[in-house]
From Swiss-Prot:
It comes from Caenorhabditis elegans. May contribute to coordination of muscle contraction as regulatory subunit of a nonessential potassium channel complex. Plays a role in the formation of muscle connections, also called muscle arm extensions, between the body wall and the motor axons in the dorsal and ventral cord. It is a multi-pass membrane protein. Residues 1-34 are annotated as: Disordered. Changing G562V: In n200; confers 'rubber band' muscle contraction. Keywords: Cell membrane, Glycoprotein, Ion transport, Membrane, Potassium, Potassium transport, Transmembrane, Transmembrane helix, Transport. The lineage of its organism: Eukaryota, Metazoa, Ecdysozoa, Nematoda, Chromadorea. This is Putative potassium channel regulatory protein unc-93. The keyword Glycoprotein applies.
């Protein structure tokens, strides 16, 4: 009979931990060993061919981490904000159960006798008397103590009367840290978070380095850098030349759109104030035709004529639209608006196709992801185009200010009873001061503004025709027989039964309603009525600056905070502005409030323009960017058309209430999409509990099936 003594082995080896428990429960990139750490094995061969070993990766990771950690204050702010958002439930907590495993060489076994000498005698120190010992003596000897086998070796399975001859027996005691029975064994529990643990991760810096080293973004940068270094001189020069041409075409396209929409946005903001009901009706026709034609016309025009010719024809239609605005009548404005809406759908569709093709070509030359490059190019494009809102409004206000004598004197410090949310449907109910502020400008001044916008459109067409390069595939498409492609229309009908798509429709329509409110209601009932038509451009320029800056900033912020905080921020800002306009007794002396409301509205509009468009891309899929942009443009244009139609039939207060409830409905739909899986599971569970499944038929009934 062989016995195992206490000093011969480690006590915890007796627990007999299974081999499966030593593996990571959720293997990640950081929980693999040696060569498996190389980005999921499929890229390991490519990295080895490029000469990127483990040492090179670690060196590059340390260098990049040193560059990233130059501002610890910003890093602490980022971590604190993420933790607060997780506490409030705005973003989900990341659960990472991975265990870092490392492969080391086995340590050779060293016999203990060569280093230590066992004592020949053991002495037991006398114990201090305690009443607890009296109770222990009365216990039965055969009572099984928890964890006793950990301290008695293999003698636990034998008789208790056997005593070791050379070693004093040890009284079994309860181990609080026993991994099986101990009360203080490691259990998954929520730990208290202090400021120190908040600023510094629980894991050490080495683990964080490993997670960064073997991240796909980091490895993609190294692979791109290595592939560029391996290119020959001729190939590198040719690739750089093509990339410079692509970037120049992108900036040329952006500047041409800047001049075009400088004219269109500036004239659009004056329609309801200068042309009255004719202006709102023409905008309804324009955006309704844009929404409908976006399903059929753009694909046919692009395939038949190519992107560049589509741009030029659309610019010519915009030119005719502005010319007709010199002498606006119902018989001329409504048809011109319909054709302008069709041209708008074509020019936006051609823009998406042109930028997408440039992004794909640039990504192949620069060894980057196509989606990353396309999104970056769209960001550059809209950064330039949104500045057109600023320039166009500044042009109109500057020309109007030179001609209006009222602009020389300041606004009166009094409450305007017929302006703001109390703006009447019948203009005859306006006060004399409000009526003078909304008086149509002299024809010469209005013609001067339109001529300035015509010059911008001509410059846009010249830039597009002389400097923009045509796509190579446009020449191939023109040789093929073209016909109307109804694929997008069929896809639109097919996705009408998709629950997720329909849940996002109310928020997209609200995006159109809030734009129509700002262009058609705020410019007339608030700014024009209180300050005068000559001030509309200045206030809308403030909106344009805020919209452009926030559209540029909110794009990268989604990577830090996620989609939910940005949507909540935009909704809260819009709700506050709507409530403010509903209770604000308009006083023209409070000039700052007009600009603050426009700036805050621009912040919210920056959220909707960037995030809703990206949300449609996420739902539809990045493989069909054209269809995603078409769906977004369709529902947004439909919302704008509905908004301009409501201006004729409801008061300002009712319009604000409709916008308020549409925003609440849209946010409910957005929250339902974000928690769609949980809602479906709850719904199935509710149906299963309320309507249990029927018992299977017996053999007699099954014969009749």
């Amino acid at each position: 009979m062989k016995f195992q003594k206490m000093g011969d082995s480690n006590t915890w080896d007796l627990v007999g931990e299974q081999q499966q428990r030593k593996k990571s429960r959720s293997p990640s990139r950081a929980s693999r060993v040696d060569s498996e750490l190389l980005v999921g094995v499929e890229n390991a061969a490519e990295l080895e061919a490029l000469g990127l070993g483990k040492e090179q990766l670690e060196e590059e990771a340390r260098r990049h981490k040193k560059q990233r950690s130059k501002s610890p204050a910003l890093e602490n702010i980022r971590k604190t904000s993420i933790h607060l958002l997780q506490k409030f439930g705005a973003i989900p907590k990341k659960k990472d159960d991975s265990v870092l495993l490392f492969r080391f060489h086995d340590i050779p076994d060293i016999p203990l006798e060569s280093l230590c000498i066992r004592p020949k005698e053991f002495f037991e120190e006398p114990k201090v008397f305690s009443f607890r010992d009296m109770g222990r003596e009365q216990q039965k000897a055969e009572v099984n103590e928890k964890c006793s086998y950990l301290f008695r070796g293999t003698s636990f399975d034998h008789d208790d009367h056997f005593e070791l001859p050379t070693e004093t027996g040890r009284v079994p005691e309860y181990d609080h840290f026993c991994p099986i029975h101990g009360s203080r064994r490691r259990l998954p529990r929520n730990k208290l978070v202090t400021m120190q643990t908040l600023m510094h991760s629980v894991d050490d810096e080495d683990n964080e380095d490993l997670a960064y080293i073997y991240g796909h973004d980091f490895l993609a940068k190294l692979v791109r850098k290595k592939k560029r270094e391996m290119m020959s001189g001729t190939e590198k020069e040719r690739a750089n030349k093509i990339k410079r041409k692509i970037m120049s075409n992108l900036w040329i396209l952006s500047v041409a759109f800047l001049f075009l929409f400088t004219a269109f946005n500036g004239l659009q903001n004056l329609q309801t104030s200068v042309n009255g009901d004719l202006g709102s009706d023409s905008l309804v026709a324009l955006y309704l035709s844009l929404a409908i034609s976006s399903l059929f016309v753009p694909s046919f025009m692009i395939n038949r004529l190519g992107c560049k010719l589509t741009f030029l024809i659309a610019i010519f239609v915009y030119f005719l639209y502005i010319v007709i605005n010199l002498r606006p009548t119902y018989s001329s404005m409504i048809p011109a608006s319909i054709f302008c809406g069709i041209a708008a759908s074509c020019i936006w569709g051609a823009k998406c196709a042109y930028i997408t093709e440039m992004g794909i070509r640039y990504a192949s030359l620069n060894f980057e992801s196509q989606t990353t490059v396309i999104v970056r190019f769209f960001g550059y494009f809209f950064m330039i185009v949104h500045c057109g809102q600023v320039v166009g409004n500044m042009v109109s206000s500057y020309i109007f200010t030179l001609s209006y004598s009222q602009a020389l004197r300041g606004p009166e410090d009094s409450i305007y009873d017929s302006c703001g949310y109390q703006f009447p449907k019948n203009l005859s109910d306006l006060t004399e001061l409000a009526e003078s502020n909304l008086a149509r400008p002299p024809q010469k001044v209005y013609v001067a503004v339109c001529l300035a916008y015509l010059a911008c459109v001509i410059i846009s067409g010249m830039i597009m025709s002389m400097f923009l390069n045509a796509l190579a595939k446009d020449a191939r498409n023109r040789k093929m027989a073209q016909k109307f492609n109804s694929e997008i229309f069929y896809l639109m009908l097919k996705h009408l039964i998709n629950i997720k798509f329909m849940l996002l429709v109310p928020l997209t329509i609200f995006n159109g309603l809030e734009q129509a409110f700002l262009v058609g209601v705020y410019t007339k009932a608030f700014v024009g009525c209180g300050l005068g038509i000559w001030q509309i451009g200045f206030v809308m320029a403030c909106f344009g600056i805020s919209d452009a800056v926030c559209s540029l900033v909110f794009g990268p912020l989604i990577k830090l905070f996620g989609r939910m905080p940005l949507f909540v921020f935009g909704a809260v800002v819009n709700l506050l502005m709507i409530v403010t306009l509903m209770v604000w007794p308009l006083n023209a002396a409070d000039t700052q409030i007009f600009y603050v409301v426009a700036a805050m509205w621009g912040m919210a509009d920056g959220v909707w323009n960037t995030q809703i468009n990206g949300f449609w891309v996420a739902l539809v899929g990045r493989q069909s960017l054209q269809f995603a942009f078409t769906k977004y443009r369709f529902w947004e244009s439909l919302g704008i058309a509905i908004g301009f139609a409501l201006i004729r039939h409801v008061t300002v207060e009712i319009y604000l209430l409709i916008t308020f409830f549409m925003l609440l409905l849209g946010m409910c739909g957005f929250l339902a999409i974000e928690n769609f899986d949980h809602i479906i599971k709850f719904w199935h569970h509710l149906i299963h509990t309320s309507c249990p499944e029927k018992e299977p038929l017996d053999d007699r009934n099954s014969d009749f099936e």
